[in-house]
């Protein structure tokens, strides 16, 4: 007897797709999965794996119709939800994003979904609701630092630099609580207030003489009392990218490579200058042996 896959049906492409997925060969997996999904629109597993594979390749436009199909079928799919969150942010349709997250169609983590909903409300023009959501999250351990950081970022994006600095100063009392990115945003908040002497002191405190080219440029701006050309976090999309980057970092430490890569790719898409997200994605791909991606 001939193998079933050689006779007819989708067993061959499906098995080939699974093999490619396990081998982290995303291009090959996508090719076979598109064939499976094209002929069997009820195969949720294949659709979710196709979304993961496409996002791993940095291809987003193809995944939105697939994600719509999954959600329209009433399936609770984190992968599909991530795709639709990405689309809403890209087109700045924050009211749709608020509705999606209010309907519990997010990541499935209370703090993460709360942060996304807060940012979505900022984008929709309802900052009061955003901060009310933040208030409900502030006692969540061990995420207090993350919530405070995003509260500071919202103030920063809104141009409330004094409020942002007050929060950064408070977070900074805890050893190691501010990441490099957080310190840079704090410096830019101080510079926006013309607090260049304080900015110089903060730069010295956190980095000392160990300055890379980016920090040397920032030091030059501080000494010349001028604002940098652009802010590291300057929009709602940048803020949401920061949420996805935090997830990617957490997942990378747990060796969940496909999901870490997905969230890093989203951060990279939403904030094109997000160097850390680009480097994290590259590191995950290197660990997978996918050097060409």
Segments predicted by a language model, with ranges:
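Alpha-helical repeat scaffolds
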Residues: 60-72, 94-106, 127-139, 161-173, ...
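Short, intrinsically disordered, charge-balanced linker/junction segments flanking boundaries
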Residues: 2, 168, 267, 281-293
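N-terminal leader/linker segments that initiate helical-solenoid repeat arrays
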Residues: 1-68, 72-79, 83, 91-94, ...
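Generic helix N-cap/helix-start motif at coil->alpha-helix transitions
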Residues: 5-13, 40-47, 73-82, 106-116, ...
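Long, contiguous interaction/recruitment modules in multidomain scaffold/adaptor proteins
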Residues: 35, 181, 185-188, 192-237
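Conserved small-residue packing positions in alpha-helical repeats and bundles
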Residues: 17, 51, 85-88, 118, ...
